[in-house]
Regions:
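N-terminal subdomain of nucleotide-sugar transferases
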Residues: 2-7, 29-87, 92-94
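Membrane-proximal helix-turn-helix segments that form the acceptor-binding/catalytic region
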Residues: 185-203, 221, 229, 234-263
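Acidic donor-binding loop of glycosyltransferase active sites
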Residues: 262, 388-403, 416
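Conserved donor-binding/catalytic core segment of Leloir-type glycosyltransferases
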Residues: 265, 306-333
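Carbohydrate-associated surface elements
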Residues: 270, 290
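Nucleotide-activated donor-binding/catalytic signature segment of Leloir-type glycosyltransferases, i.e.
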Residues: 360-378, 390
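Short hydrophobic beta-strand element within catalytic cores of glycosyltransferases
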Residues: 413, 417-420
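Conserved acidic donor-binding segment of nucleotide-sugar-dependent glycosyltransferases
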Residues: 431-442, 451-456
Length: 490
């Protein structure tokens, strides 16, 4: 039986990249209908690097370019958004509304106050919500997002809910035992109590909601996802996805949030399947988060080449956190050098996080200074333009956490091959432009690195595949699908 983690390298060598038509930026033609007034609710601080804030910023820009009105409700302070690293100043954009924000930080980022304070603030600022907005688009599951649900139900406004991430894994990875069980149970209880007034009005599992008949056509409905699943109580995969109380509690929270929406969006089919497996009954559409067209508007990526036994240039641009598994990848580099003393690399790290000190300590202990470049936080707009130039590979090392991995799409836009540990990410990598390790173990990634090191022609082949891929991951393509959903709900 073939290993689902592995990529057949012989097939890769013999394959021809799929050709695609040249992609124009902003190919959308405005529809001859009225512009929409969209309110986005998110608990994610938009000034930090990362897939969710990047996708929200790109979504806002694309919708506004088409003449739609977008208002974002999010946590933060004017001081936070004036940080030059963010280049996303709320003080300069009146359509970014900062909700009441707690004085403490959560994972280094601002977090909104209790939901009741957020709803009160919004109702005072917009006393006629139903006349101000056509629909709400919610991008998370915490206090501001719950405020969006409560207000939408109160004012009879349609809801689109994007489910971005595996909150069960975030708790499982980052919170130590036994506190993870307490934390997850507490979060789920608060979520349930806050939404209890509207939860009883939402459709129960198996209930035929008439809205489903009005939902997007089969191209966006992904009927094959529904048909491929057994009823949740019969499916043994549930035990694998939620083997602990903590993870089950977080799945309950995610499912509750999704089932209160009129339409659910996920960035990948594999995540959509998992949500339905756990009981999401609302229509789900798979729409990529997308990357901003402007990020690559003045950028001409080249085909990567790698010469025999030169240093392998590897780029990391993501959080330095446990769920992203930066330390296991550093261990892979150490093992690769141990297995092949002639293996040389230059590993560039862009990003920050709670594992920065451990990263620096590991690098000082095991690698020479020339092999590691720790750059910290770089303005997101500069990463693709300046820092991918001399790279051979991009790495995304998370496992069962990322639902899409925007890093993959950004690397693809640069024709930069991707190596990864999670076979679910194969769905995201365009046109066989990357390689997956045989397992998430550090040694498996080390073996993949050495395979590339000894077969340098793979870099050019992977890069050519990416160059020939259709650029459907651009926001200008994804926004067409999103607008179709909006139109059918509004």
């Amino acid at each position: 039986m073939s290993n689902p983690h592995s990529q057949n390298l012989e097939n890769l060598k013999n394959s021809e990249p799929t050709k695609s038509e040249p992609t124009q930026l902003n190919p959308i033609q405005s529809e001859p209908t009225k512009s929409l007034r969209i309110a986005i609710f998110t608990d994610v601080f938009l000034g930090i690097p990362g897939g969710i804030p990047s996708s929200i910023r790109a979504q806002k820009a694309s919708l506004e370019a088409l003449g739609h009105q977008v208002t974002i409700f999010c946590p933060g302070t004017p001081k936070d958004y004036m940080n030059p690293l963010t280049k996303f100043g709320a003080n300069q954009d009146p359509s970014i509304i900062i909700v009441p924000t707690a004085k403490f930080l959560v994972n280094g980022a601002p977090f909104s106050k209790w939901t009741k304070y957020v709803t009160r603030f919004i109702e005072q600022k917009y006393p006629n919500l139903a006349e101000t907005f056509d629909l709400f688009h919610i991008h998370y599951e915490a206090t501001t997002s719950m405020a969006g649900l409560l207000l939408a139900k109160k004012y009879n406004i349609k809801i689109v809910q994007t489910m971005h991430g595996r909150e069960d894994m975030a708790i499982a990875i980052n919170v130590p035992h036994p506190f993870k069980t307490l934390a997850a149970t507490g979060i789920n209880l608060i979520h349930h109590a806050t939404l209890k007034p509207i939860t009883k009005k939402s459709p129960k599992p198996g209930h035929q909601n008439p809205e489903i008949k009005k939902s997007p056509d089969p191209d966006y409905q992904n009927a094959e996802i529904k048909n491929s699943l057994q009823p949740s109580h019969q499916n043994p995969a549930l035990k694998n996805l939620a083997p602990t109380i903590a993870r089950r509690q977080m799945w309950q929270m995610m499912v509750r949030q999704a089932n209160l929406a009129d339409q659910v969006i996920t960035p990948s089919a594999h995540f959509a399947k998992k949500l339905q497996l756990f009981g999401v009954t609302r229509p789900i559409s798979v729409i990529s988060n997308g990357i901003s067209d402007q990020e690559i508007a003045n950028f001409t990526p080249r085909i990567r080449t790698y010469q025999d036994h030169e240093p392998l240039h590897i780029l990391w641009f993501s959080r330095l956190s446990k769920e992203k598994r930066i330390l296991p990848f550093l261990e892979s580099l150490r093992i690769a050098q141990e297995l092949e003393p002639n293996f040389r690399f230059i590993f560039t790290i862009i990003g920050d996080g709670n594992q920065m000190s451990k990263v620096r300590k590991f690098c000082r202990k095991h690698f020479d200074e020339a092999s590691i470049k720790v750059l910290g936080t770089i303005p997101h707009q500069e990463i693709l333009q300046k820092y991918t130039k001399d790279q051979h590979l991009s790495i995304i090392n998370s496992y069962q956490f990322d639902t899409q991995g925007l890093t993959i799409l950004e690397a693809a836009a640069c024709n930069l091959p991707v190596i990864y540990a999670d076979p679910d990410m194969s769905e995201i990598v365009p046109n066989h432009g990357g390689l997956c390790a045989k397992s998430p173990a550090p040694r498996a990634m080390a073996e993949l690195l050495l395979k590339i090191y000894h077969q340098p022609e793979l870099i050019q082949k992977l890069s050519q595949n990416l160059a020939a891929s259709e650029k459907t991951y651009l926001q200008s393509h994804q926004i067409e699908k999103l607008l179709k959903l909006y139109r059918q709900l509004s």
